[in-house]
Amino acid sequence: MRKLLFGMLFFGAALGLKAQYGSLNDILTRLEERKGINQHLENVNIDNKKFVFIKDFEDHTERDFIIIKGNTVTYVEVFDDKASGESSSNVFTGDIIRKKNMVSLRANMLENKKVPIPVTKTLLLTKQDNILYLIDVNKKDRWIDEESFSKTKK
């Protein structure tokens, strides 16, 4: 009788733990996706995409654009001075390599002139709420897909 009672108790505890493991695993998966980890976006096409990053400072606003066309990339920096209202820009071109969710950008031409130190970025492709993002691995800056941004603004 005791063995039967312990056996049933053990069996019930095992089933309870399995149910908790399933819900805990779902929660961890959602958290990983929110962080950008454990997403399988190999089939997402980023060709002909434009990503935007805007940073506001006290004296100026910085807008950065990453435009991807095939294996080439155009990286544009636009600086808007708040005091004078003037804008200046730098247009870099280069190449891009993508392995799964990681995107490596190397822009070594500034307005068709080779620069000694190219602009390099290592970016993680993520998707949250059906919006594509590129997250800078080093700085944690987030570029949003302009197409997704313009859809939500309409």
Located regions from the model:
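Bacterial Sec-dependent N-terminal signal peptides
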Residues: 1-24
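Lipid interaction determinants
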Residues: 20-91, 106-154
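A short, structured loop/turn motif at beta-sheet edges
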Residues: 95-102, 127
